[in-house]
């Protein structure tokens, strides 16, 4: 809120501020989608243009002074971490597209992990250390706008494939399935 308050105070004093930049040094665990969207909504109350700058999303969870830099080091990235990385980029760009009336630009810190200030082992950028596009690049580039605002109908009924008297799985008219999972504590 401090930056918002400062910019608002300046605008109220007559300073001609029309836009603001939001640095995007994130990781796969944060900030939350809700916090990112809330920040965009809040800033859009006082400016006409928001630029996302220095965007990178690293695969580790260090923040601030706890960042680990990894120049020259390489390690395999587990598939589930790659999935989280893609999901974070997908979620972020879904939010940015939703606010395209005010979010006018996205600038990455750099293109390739090799050139990242974080080092290649943090895998923060759309291209790998050899400048080859990673899955996150395709996630950003090849988005499906129909998936940005999916509404799932709540007309679920037991599947015709169920055992007699079995309630689950359920399916809806769009083809989505709902399962009930019993897991011990």
Give short role names for the model-derived ranges:
Residues 1-11, 31-40:
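Distinct, well-ordered alpha-helical segments
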Residues 17-19, 71-73, 157, 168:
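A short alpha-helix capping/helix-coil boundary motif
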Residues 31-51, 55-151:
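Aromatic-rich peripheral "rim/lid" segments of glycoside hydrolase catalytic domains that contact
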Residues 17, 109-112, 176-183:
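Hydrophobic/aromatic-rich, well-ordered segments within soluble, folded domains that form packed cores
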Residues 1, 19-26, 52-55, 108-110:
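A cross-domain feature marking catalytic cores of carbohydrate-active enzymes
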Residues 12-16, 99-101:
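Short helix-capping segments at alpha-helix termini
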Residues 2-12, 120-129:
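Short, electropositive alpha-helical surface patch
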Residues 149-185:
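Insoluble glucan recognition modules
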